[in-house]
Design a protein with these regions (language model features):
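Low-complexity, acidic/polar, glycine-enriched regions of mature
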Residues: 1-174
Length: 174
């Protein structure tokens, strides 16, 4: 029986938030994390996002995202994902090789989430790439201009959709 070993990861996340007639896409750094291997199989992992690294071309928006209206970075400087299960996929139409299920914590609110990743090897690097969809940001206490919290008619073009899309790209040495 192969023993599990844990390897450190680094990487980044591209995020996209949308509102009426607009979309904003920026980045966020993965500052800590690990992938757990058993032989050649990925069996677990976790990663921490430094919310202070939220970046976008508009400094005013970045400041607002870091404020209590959104991520309240001064109080909640990190967000974290911890894997609960990893399932190998065969022949997935999207090209994904694994289904990952786990717990995502943002603003000290933890909820289960599942997403597909493509795990690939190149040289001495193991890389995981995938898209994560947070369907309801209000579950994490991010309620600013949400249609679930505020009157849509009053929000008008100030409405911000509740879905947040994240594109994960992390890697580790084999």
């Amino acid at each position: 029986m192969a023993l599990a070993n844990t390897r450190p990861v680094s990487g980044s996340i591209q995020w996209t938030g949308t509102g009426v007639g607009k979309a904003h896409t920026g980045t966020l750094k993965v500052t800590q994390g690990s992938i757990t291997m058993k032989g050649k199989d990925v069996v677990g992992g976790e990663f921490t996002m430094d919310m202070n690294t939220i970046d976008y071309k508009n400094a005013k928006l970045v400041g607002h995202l870091k404020s209590p209206d959104f991520f309240e970075v001064s109080k909640f400087p990190t967000a974290k994902f911890v894997t609960k299960s990893v399932t190998a996929l065969k022949g997935d139409a999207s090209g994904a090789t694994h289904q990952i299920s786990g717990d995502l914590t943002i603003r000290d609110q933890t909820h289960p989430i599942a997403f597909k990743v493509k795990i690939s090897e190149a040289g001495d690097q193991l890389r995981a790439q995938g898209d994560i969809v947070i369907e309801d940001r209000t579950k994490y206490g991010i309620k600013y201009n949400s249609k679930k919290v505020f009157d849509v008619a009053k929000l008008g073009d100030k409405l911000i959709e509740d879905e947040i899309k994240l594109s994960l790209d992390v890697s580790t040495s084999k």
